[in-house]
């Protein structure tokens, strides 16, 4: 019996065509993209109206897609999401954290070049994605350039080559070649699921990001903290989560967290880990900052969005980080 796959086409480069104003999303992809695979799988398409350039994706879009996926999951063997690459890792991470107890594969893919462009990576990425359903995953994953990555920890790492995505902490779940199929499979055994328990993001959730750079005085950042309307802040600090040990900055962090707001400290190093290794990091932890461990920006954004949406406190955020193997 053929597997039934629900295809959610959100937009992105994969289906774009050239217009007088530049590349624009086009629905023509529907008629040809998955036709070569129809002998083995049954596809039902849902084309978002309008199709969205992924740089314009909003929390409302992501919530709408989640609600549609949740409604369709009982009737399908898996979900394929065609998404623009600019924010695909953000969406994948949010899907992964929102869909607790997922027991079917949700595969996201896109391309660096339009489907009809010369030497496009789109046909190969589609072939990889379709083949990934044979692995019977029970999680959200990104299929790109011959590799299947777990959503959590994944990032877009290149705009210049076909190898657009990577997961520097967790690596690939599996690798694919046309003449070998899947190999180097490292999918972990999944725990028994008691059923899907969705945790949807609120479109009104406000999360901000600040990145430390040399010469950007701690005083400037601390002066800005009291005026942030955001409900959670992600701080991209140095190395192991280090920041200036300026007393005013530490006091500002403490005042921010004492308002019940969340401040998550992550490393700006692509393969970094925020932990209180040095005294500066420990001072921030004592002030109420949450060390995000191996959390990358995309995962941190998803985590803080759900934290704000569901009124999580710092202890709950740390519990989630441990469950994600990020601490």
Sequence positions of predicted segments:
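Active-site histidine-anchored catalytic micro-motif
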Residues: 1-218, 222, 227-327
């Amino acid at each position: 019996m053929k597997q039934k796959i629900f295809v959610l086409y959100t937009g992105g480069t994969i289906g774009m065509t050239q217009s007088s104003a530049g590349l624009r999303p086009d629905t023509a992809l529907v008629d040809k993209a998955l036709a070569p695979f129809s002998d083995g799988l049954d596809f039902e398409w849902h084309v978002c109206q309008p199709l969205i350039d992924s740089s314009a994706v909003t929390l409302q879009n992501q919530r709408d897609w989640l609600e549609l996926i949740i409604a369709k999951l009982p009737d399908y063997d898996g979900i394929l999401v065609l998404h623009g690459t600019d924010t695909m890792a953000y969406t994948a991470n949010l899907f992964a954290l929102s869909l607790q107890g997922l027991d079917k594969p949700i595969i996201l893919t896109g391309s660096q070049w339009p489907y009809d462009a010369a030497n496009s990576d789109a046909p190969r990425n589609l072939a990889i994605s379709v083949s990934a359903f044979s692995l019977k995953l029970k999680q959200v994953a990104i299929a790109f350039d011959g590799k299947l990555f777990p959503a959590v920890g994944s990032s877009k790492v290149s705009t210049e080559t076909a190898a657009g995505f990577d997961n520097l902490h967790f690596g690939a779940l599996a690798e694919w070649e046309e003449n070998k199929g899947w190999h180097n499979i490292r999918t972990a055994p999944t725990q028994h699921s008691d059923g899907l328990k969705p945790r949807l993001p609120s479109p009104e959730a406000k999360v901000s990001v600040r990145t430390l750079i040399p010469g950007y005085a701690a005083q400037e950042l601390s002066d800005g903290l009291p005026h942030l309307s955001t409900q959670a802040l992600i701080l991209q600090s140095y190395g192991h989560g280090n920041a200036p040990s300026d007393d005013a900055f530490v006091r500002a962090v403490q005042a921010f967290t004492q308002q019940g707001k969340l401040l998550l400290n992550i490393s700006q190093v692509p393969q970094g880990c925020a932990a209180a290794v040095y005294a500066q990091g420990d001072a921030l932890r004592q002030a109420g900052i949450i060390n995000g461990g191996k959390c990358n920006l995309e995962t941190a954004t998803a985590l803080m969005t759900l934290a704000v949406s569901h009124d999580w406190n710092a202890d709950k955020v740390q519990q989630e980080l441990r469950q994600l193997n990020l601490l």
